[in-house]
């Protein structure tokens, strides 16, 4: 009996065990069904089409230049005026991020200015490279159409497209884990010890740029160690494997001691409370089965689509079908590549050190193997269908069509609504018109970012949209080359406008504001005060989350003698804790 697509792959029985293990990924279909599937050249053309579609989808998302949304702003506000050394300190707005990612983002800002494009450049480049690298890895792990399914899922998955154009470290988490996976797979095929040296040399970069990279590195190291034990690895392989693990441990200790400990000490309690629902209930083990089921049927497996509240149930079913095939055929290497990193992740979550589930961003490091597992599950589903007389050719075409429609739908949505929320779009539109317009007619100063005046202190310590306001201001200052307020130019015809942002959820320090106004009145006459209200709405653009206000205080000289500009250094000291 022939496998219905084994003949489509280039795998030969004389190749390594990794290649031979891909034979079982096919199904048991007859020769007639085998002939009904696309030939090898057609599969290659389809694979190239999906890769190019993935590049196009990511490029469109990046080019559309979505407004920064709140989660991006919380992190990006730290790149406005912090130095590289200051990024080693606790970050503002309860943020934690690996230091090498912070430094690369800061370097991009210094090179290209503070803008949406520069802030998202590193994730975008990482994502494009990942597409081609994943295609290579998938071809090493899977045969024929399974390769196509894996690459297609990876190319059209919403999380992969989204994090290609988002100024957060989750796209680089996936990229670095994929690089490690690629090196392990190449080592297993060729048994070249130098690849283990490459893994060792990668550890300082990977663990310094990605927190979950330690899960991938640790899990893959366990897989390589088990292979060396089972196959009696050479002395050189053992030496290089030990060297890899030594650099892994040293890199983790150094980066944690330098940055991780500082961030954890500052934000550990807040993050633990914020993500407490995403830690497994190890003290209530009777709840664990339901928790695991719901977690994996929700955000953790949101590929190519999915989300909270069981929205990823179909993906979970495909993954379970794939796991069933892996277990039935005793493909322990495959199981190790997937379950090793995820198992360490789960252990960290059980210790309440890193959330498991709750959002797809936390499983980005595992996305390559999840997409491969989904492909195996699709293979199993098509094999089951073929046993009941369904045409393999039609099933294959149906799967490819569905995946293409998913990708096309995502691109269409981005083109129609190039923003995360309408409130984000309105906030950026206001910044673009307000800051440029006022700078032409007046001397303008943002009280917080330009002068370091903080009259609503809580909004700059908590997760508020003040970060959004400050980032949009910094973007417009750089984009339009707006200069700081020059008090020597203030006159009756060119007044001084002082701008204050406030979030209605946080209390205004009225006494401090009145004191500042009294001080300003000694030198200037307050000729107007206007407050522009903005409703901050939820993603559905219906539910009111809070009211935001942009207050403007307009002054003209009282006696014609301008005062000195307040020291700029106060801004960074006030923003940083």
Regions found by a protein language model. Name each.
Residues 1-41, 566-577:
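Short, intrinsically disordered terminal tails adjacent to the first/last structured region
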Residues 24-27, 31, 39, 43-386, ...:
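Membrane-proximal helix-loop-helix interfaces that form the catalytic/acceptor-binding platform
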């Amino acid at each position: 009996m022939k496998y219905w697509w084994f003949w489509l792959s280039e795998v030969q029985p004389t190749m390594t065990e990794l290649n031979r293990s891909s034979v079982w990924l096919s199904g048991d279909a007859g020769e007639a069904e085998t002939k009904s599937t696309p030939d090898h050249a057609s599969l290659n053309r389809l694979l190239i089409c999906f890769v190019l579609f993935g590049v196009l989808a990511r490029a469109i998302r990046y080019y559309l230049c979505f407004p920064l949304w709140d989660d991006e702003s919380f992190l990006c506000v730290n790149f406005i005026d912090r130095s590289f050394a200051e990024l080693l300190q606790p970050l503002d707005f309860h943020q934690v991020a690996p230091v090498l990612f912070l430094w690369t983002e800061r370097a991009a800002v210094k090179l290209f200015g503070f803008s949406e494009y520069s802030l998202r450049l590193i994730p975008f480049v990482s994502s494009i490279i990942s597409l081609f690298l994943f295609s290579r890895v998938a071809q090493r792990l899977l045969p024929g159409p399974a390769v196509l399914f894996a690459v297609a899922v990876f190319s059209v998955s919403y999380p992969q497209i989204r994090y290609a154009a988002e100024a957060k470290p989750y796209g680089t988490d996936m990229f670095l884990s994929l690089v490690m996976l690629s090196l392990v797979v190449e080592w297993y095929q060729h048994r070249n010890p130098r690849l283990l040296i490459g893994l060792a040399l990668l550890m300082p970069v990977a663990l310094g740029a990605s927190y979950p990279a330690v899960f991938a590195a640790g899990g893959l190291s366990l897989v390589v160690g088990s292979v060396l034990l089972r196959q009696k690895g050479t002395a050189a392989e053992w030496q290089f494997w030990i060297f890899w693990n030594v650099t892994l441990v040293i890199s983790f200790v150094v980066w944690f001691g330098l940055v991780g400990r500082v961030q954890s000490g500052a934000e550990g309690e807040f993050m633990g409370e914020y993500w407490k629902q995403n830690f497994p209930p190890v003290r209530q083990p009777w709840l664990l089965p339901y928790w695991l089921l719901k977690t994996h049927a929700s955000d953790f497996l949101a590929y190519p689509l999915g989300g909270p509240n069981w929205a990823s149930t179909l993906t979970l079913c495909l993954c379970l079908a794939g796991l069933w095939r892996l277990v039935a055929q005793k493909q322990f290497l495959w199981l190790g590549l997937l379950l090793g990193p995820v198992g360490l992740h789960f252990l960290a979550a059980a210790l309440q050190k890193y959330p498991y589930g709750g959002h797809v961003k936390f499983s980005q490091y595992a996305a390559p193997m999840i997409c491969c597992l989904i492909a195996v599950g699709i293979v199993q589903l098509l094999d089951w269908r073929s046993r009941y007389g369904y045409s393999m050719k039609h099933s294959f075409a149906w799967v490819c069509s569905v995946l293409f429609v998913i990708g096309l739908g995502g691109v269409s949505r981005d083109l129609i609504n190039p923003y995360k929320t309408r409130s984000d779009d309105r906030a950026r539109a206001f910044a673009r018109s307000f800051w440029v317009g006022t700078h032409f007619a007046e001397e303008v100063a943002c009280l917080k970012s330009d002068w370091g005046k903080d009259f609503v202190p809580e909004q700059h310590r908590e997760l508020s949209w003040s970060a959004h306001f400050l980032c949009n201001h910094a973007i417009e200052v750089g984009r339009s080359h707006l200069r700081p307020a020059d008090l020597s130019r203030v006159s009756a015809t060119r007044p001084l406008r002082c701008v204050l942002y406030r979030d209605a959820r946080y209390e205004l320090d009225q006494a401090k504001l009145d004191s500042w106004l009294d001080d300003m009145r000694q030198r200037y006459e307050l000729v107007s005060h206007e407050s522009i209200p903005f409703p901050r709405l939820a993603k559905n653009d219906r539910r009111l989350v809070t009211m935001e206000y942009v207050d403007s205080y307009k002054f003209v000289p009282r006696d014609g003698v301008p005062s000195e500009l307040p020291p700029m250094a106060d801004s960074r000291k006030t923003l940083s804790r």
